[in-house]
Amino acid sequence: MKFNYKILHNYGNFLAVLKEIIFNVCEVREMSNDQTRAPVYEALEKLRRKRVVPFDVPGHKRGRGNPELVELLGEKCVGIDVNSMKPLDNLCHPVSVIRDAEELAARAFGAENAFLMVGGTTSAVQAMILSNCKRGDKIILPRNVHKSAINALVLCGAIPVYVNPEVNHQLGISLGMNLESVRKAVKENPDAVAVLVNNPTYYGICSDICSIVKLAHEHGMKVLADEAHGTHLYFQPQLPVSAMAAGADMAAVSMHKSGGSLTQSSILLTNKGVNADYVRQIINLTQTTSGSYLLLASLDISRRNLALRGEESFAKVMDMAE
């Protein structure tokens, strides 16, 4: 039998190419965990320096068409308020710099996946519920839930099972969900598909989310966390546990409230076992196709700031509070 050395040579070339591809992928993955980077912001700065003449939207033409806007916001601000284009990726289907920014956010927050949101945490909360609930499904949630959750129930037709939070009558504020109250709701509604938890509430009250996650998962229910006021929980170990660390399935995080990004910017986090592609489809049902790069860049820069300096910053705040 005559051995075909040409086949062996081609196979060797194939292995060499494959090795290079694997090396490059690993290198990209390693780079994607470099929290000093801000991929969206970097891409915007690169575009701005090229001084490209815009023939597309937005109509202010990076300030040239609206001098008053430039006077109000500044040349640099309006200069990076641009439309989606190849170097800047696309929020609806990210494949480059936005994808990289989302991967960095996922690692910074200890999540499996992260989605940059430009419709506020309202859109993130609604995406959580719409991803998990269909018409007629039950969802257990606190009576003092944000109205974005109620609006999501209107959209998907899910049935709320309310848990009344305890009340501090001295301060006149509602507290978190009592574990026994949640246990009772789970027992009475074993067909519920999810439990939603405020972590924390508007007043900073945290429920026992670790125990709630354990209870819900034991009964096959997903745990969704409204962390509109909980960004700081991810970056200071002396604070109460974050939803992702507690094992919740999804969390909506208002970066603009305590994370330093621009108003209306938010992040949706998912843990292992959540279908990220399906979540992306749900997000695209309601979120704009014209994502603001000002908001995206602010999320990118703020994530970097929190990852590098968040623990120290929040420690100072805690010291001042004491």
Locate the predicted segments by residue.
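Conserved PLP-enzyme active-site core in the AAT-like
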Residues: 37-45, 49, 69-72, 93, ...
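Short hydrophobic targeting helices and cationic amphipathic motifs
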Residues: 5-18
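N-terminal "arm"/small-domain region of PLP-dependent enzymes with the aminotransferase-like
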Residues: 25-96
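Conserved N-terminal alpha-helix of the aminotransferase class I/II PLP-enzyme fold
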Residues: 78-120
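Short glycine-rich, polar/acidic loop-and-turn segments at beta strand-coil junctions
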Residues: 61, 120-121
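Acidic, Ala/Val/Gly-enriched low-complexity intrinsically disordered segments
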Residues: 16-20, 25-28
